[in-house]
Every structure is written in structure tokens, then in C-alpha cells.
């Protein structure tokens, strides 16, 4: 993995392959061309996904989380369709509503 602060990490895959993924973390106040006009505390961008996911075939679905307070997800749905559409046909997009999905998340508390 290549991290935006310049550090580079390589993680071996099960078949011995190495996969490079660029990760950028954007903090509030930073101005980037794709964040202009957005009031976001943090953004995470993971690139080089086409090489990684293309070996698995067509994308059948995308699960997008909706903020229960702001209800924001519309712009992310549009951007996700355009972005993931370049890797193949999108069969389904599902919005994740945190208020309806109250599970144990891997254990009891």
C-alpha cells in the first residue's frame, strides 16, 4: 500500500502477489479539486481498485452508508455509480440506513 504521507507498504497476497493501493486522507480545511465546496471532516480515497477487482468480474452491488443525522448519501451514490461503472455494469446500488441496522457487530456488549 502507498500512503499519502509518502510511506510505502507492500502486503503479500495469498498467491504471493503484491498489490499497490494509494490511500489519501483529507482533513477539514484542506482544499482539493474533488472536495472544493464540501464541508467534510475526513475523506478517504482508495485508488487502483480496477486492477484489484477486475479479476473477480462484474460488480453486482454497491452498499452506500447514509448518515442518519444529515441523511447525506445522494452525491455519493451518483459519484459511486460513475466511479464503479468504469469497472463494469452495476447491477444494484443499496443505501445502508444505520438506524435500521442495529446488530451486535461481531459480539455482544
Swiss-Prot record:
Residues 40-50 form the RRM domain. Residues 1-36 are annotated as: Disordered. One of its GO terms (cellular component) is ribonucleoprotein complex. Keywords: Cytoplasm, Methylation, Nucleus, Ribonucleoprotein, RNA-binding. It is found in: Cytoplasm; Nucleus. Residues 23-36 have a biased composition (Basic and acidic residues). Its main location: cytoplasm. Signal peptide: none annotated. It comes from the Eukaryota. Coiled coil: none annotated. The modification Asymmetric dimethylarginine is found at residues 102, 105. One of its GO terms (molecular function) is RNA binding. This is Heterogeneous nuclear ribonucleoprotein-like protein HD40. It comes from Artemia salina.
Amino acid at each position: 500500500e502507498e500512503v499519502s504521507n509518502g510511506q510505502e507498504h507492500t502486503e503479500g497476497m495469498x498467491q504471493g502477489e503484491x498489490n499497490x493501493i494509494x490511500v489519501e486522507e483529507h482533513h477539514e480545511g484542506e482544499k482539493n479539486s474533488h472536495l472544493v465546496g464540501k464541508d467534510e471532516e475526513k475523506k478517504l480515497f482508495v485508488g487502483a481498485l480496477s486492477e484489484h477487482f477486475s479479476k473477480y468480474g462484474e460488480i453486482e452491488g454497491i452498499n452506500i452508508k447514509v448518515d442518519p443525522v444529515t441523511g447525506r448519501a445522494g452525491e455519493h451514490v451518483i459519484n459511486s455509480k460513475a466511479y464503479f461503472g468504469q469497472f463494469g455494469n452495476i447491477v444494484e446500488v443499496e443505501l445502508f440506513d444505520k438506524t435500521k441496522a442495529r446488530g451486535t457487530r461481531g459480539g455482544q456488549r
